[in-house]
C-alpha cells in the first residue's frame, strides 16, 4: 500500500487568509506557525506582513517542496508557472491530486447543471445578490 503522502495533494488552498489576518491584527505576534498545504495562505501572509516570522509546516514533504517551487517562480517572475494570466492545466497551481478532482467536478457541473457563462457570471465580483438569485432560478 502506498503512502498518501507520496505526491502533492493540494496545489492551492481553497480557504482565505482573513482568519489569520484577524489574529495578526488583534494580537500582533512576531512569529506564527502555518500549515503548508498549497502555500497560498503562507505566501499571502508574507506579502501582507513581510516582517512576520512565519514557520510553515506540513506532514507531507511534497507539499513543502511544492511551496518552494512557487517561491522560486515568484522570485523569478515566472507567472506562467503559477497559471497567472493564462490557462494552463499542468502548472504549479493545478498539479495536486485533488486539483484534478476539482477540475473534473467543475467540468461536470458545467456540462450537466449550468453553463460556463452562468457559472462565471455567478462568481463575478460585479454580480449583485439579486442577479445571483436570478441565475439560480434559471
What are these model-predicted stretches?
Residues 25-28, 49-52:
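Intrinsically disordered, low-complexity coil segments
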